[in-house]
Amino acid sequence: MLHKYFVELLGTMFLSFVIFATGNYLAIGAALSVAVLLGGVISGAAFNPAITIALFYAGKLSTNDVIPYILAQIVGGIAGFELVKQFLK
């Protein structure tokens, strides 16, 4: 089973890849839908540090999960960008 932090990293990477590669609103919405459907059960599918902070303040995310989630999302965003750079060479 995938760990929730790894799911956040993968989901954010997939979403940022689609955002940087296409910029198409329909593709971004479809990518977000797929990421939420696949990762939501495991991690809650925040895929965005702002959403993570909002979930924390709403009491839906524990204090111990906030920093690892945000770090995973930052790494995932950078990884998605780097993948796009490699594909567009």
Task: Report the location of each language-model feature.
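Membrane-interface helix-loop junctions and terminal tails of multi-pass membrane proteins
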Residues: M1-K89
